[in-house]
């Protein structure tokens, strides 16, 4: 039975790094086998991808200077410098002001965007 592949991008996030560190500690202490740790990481990849796909309700707008871009193995990578990221949150239930939307702007010196083919995990 073929299992669909999921990107391992989120293993480099804060929570992903913490999970990898915890699993490494358990392996080095002899409490779990490396094969179990790999299954945990594969499950993590799947759950994060599906959760983001199903539960994301925010919209981002990025404005800045494109510094570098590249495409390899169906993955685009963009480096944007001096950019402003506008985050628009849309909530399912209306907030007290009636609109249900909120917006915030974040200024960053350098932003890396990694865009993957969504068909890989289907």
UniProtKB/Swiss-Prot annotation:
Name of this protein = Transcription initiation factor IIA subunit 2
Assembly, per entry = TFIIA is a heterodimer composed of the large TOA1 and a small TOA2 subunits. Interacts with TBP. Interacts with TAF11. Interacts with KAP122.
Give GO MF terms, alphabetically: RNA polymerase II core promoter sequence-specific DNA binding; RNA polymerase II general transcription initiation factor activity; TBP-class protein binding
Q: What is the effect of changing residue 41 to D?
A: Decreases ability to interact with Toa1 and TAF11, display mutant growth phenotypes and defects in transcription in vivo
| UniProt-listed GO biological process terms | positive regulation of transcription by RNA polymerase II; positive regulation of transcription initiation by RNA polymerase II; RNA polymerase II preinitiation complex assembly; transcription initiation at RNA polymerase II promoter
**SUPFAM superfamilies attached to this UniProt entry:** Transcription factor IIA (TFIIA), alpha-helical domain (SSF47396), Transcription factor IIA (TFIIA), beta-barrel domain (SSF50784)
Q: Which cysteines are joined by disulfide bonds?
A: none
Among Pfam families, the record links this protein to: TFIIA_gamma_C (PF02751), TFIIA_gamma_N (PF02268)
List residues, modification Phosphoserine: 95, 102
Species of origin reads: Saccharomyces cerevisiae (strain ATCC 204508 / S288c) (Baker's yeast)
Q: State the UniProt keywords alphabetically.
A: Cytoplasm, Nucleus, Phosphoprotein, Transcription, Transcription regulation
Similarity annotation: Belongs to the TFIIA subunit 2 family.
Quote the InterPro entries the UniProt record gives: TFIIA_a-hlx, TFIIA_b-brl, TFIIA_gsu, TFIIA_gsu_C, TFIIA_gsu_N
